[in-house]
Amino acid sequence: MSMLPSFFKDTFGLTTAAAALVASSYAFMNLMSRPGGGFISDRFGRKKTLLILTAGLACGYLGMSMVGSSWPLWAAIAVAMCCSFFVQAGEGAVFAVVPLIKRSQTGAIAGMTGAYGNVGAVVYLIAYATLPVNQFFLLIAGTAVLGFVSLLFLSLIHI
């Protein structure tokens, strides 16, 4: 999340460098979480994994919406890293589902998955610029809940 350094700087009064270092904990989680999401998906089932990870990221962003300047910095970092685990693992699990949606269009679906991820990044940065930070995180949590409900209707082909 490219807005996290700004969030930590504004919320905790950190220097730009310190805020960037703290926010890097979110990106650091990507190293194990994204492949881990794919692994979990392979092991326990794609749809079930996506449902659990999407519920987890909704809870994670709900937690992020509660972070404030009265929180200890370590607790805010812990919530961000927990939230990041579900987001990054969810990304790995999403790409595990791509070939199971419509096998004849796997490439197109993979391309759209990546493209719409970038569209989401732009939309959420605009939301961050216009909403109070707690409402911004609640917006993401609410979107995750909508995603969860949508996943309930997901049909996968069986190879």
Placement of each model-derived feature along the sequence:
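Extracytoplasmic gate region of multi-pass secondary transporters
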Residues: 1-27
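Residue-level signature of mid-helix packing/kink "hotspots" within the transmembrane helices
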Residues: 27-35, 118, 122
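Helix-to-loop junctions at the C-terminal end of transmembrane segments
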Residues: 33-45
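Cytoplasmic membrane-interface "Motif A"-like loop-to-helix N-cap segments
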Residues: 43-54
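C-terminal ends and interior cores of transmembrane alpha-helices
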Residues: 55-69
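Intracellular juxtamembrane helix-capping segments at the cytosolic ends
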Residues: 89-102
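Symmetry-related core transmembrane helices of the 12-TM Major Facilitator Superfamily/SLC fold
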Residues: 136-153
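Conserved small/polar residues in nucleotide/adenosyl-binding loops
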Residues: 157-159
